Amino acid sequence: MSLHNKSLGSKGESLAVTYLERHRYKILERNFRCRGGEIDIVARDGKTIVFVEVKTRTSGHYGPPQLAVTSFKQRQISKAALTWLAKQRQLDACARFDVISITFSGQMPQIEHIPNAFELAY
């Protein structure tokens, strides 16, 4: 991954955190990594644990950012989510998978939040 892509991704994740906090989510962890995968943001929405994948683009040339959350990526996120829940001893917690899509194509970034974007994937 190029330095530009890492910088863009980091900027997108920071913007997503700000967005979630403004919508009264509590951020529990950022960039959780384990053997099975990675989760950009772990948050709490009321009593629900929310695993958030952030996809950031500079244009819609390759389609909307959320299309980059492939079935393979969903399986990786799911494995990481199960690991996170086990480490927190919260395997019985209500949880969901959201995607936040950010496009920087003009003055103001466009943010789309997709709650329940996908189900737990094996």
UniProtKB/Swiss-Prot annotation:
GO terms for molecular function: nucleic acid binding. Pfam families: UPF0102 (PF02021). Disulfide bonds: none annotated. Coiled coil: none annotated. SUPFAM superfamilies: Restriction endonuclease-like. NCBIfam families: PRK12497.1-3 (NF009150), PRK12497.3-3 (NF009154), PRK14675.1 (NF011268), YraN family protein (TIGR00252). Belongs to the UPF0102 family. This is UPF0102 protein Gmet_2864.
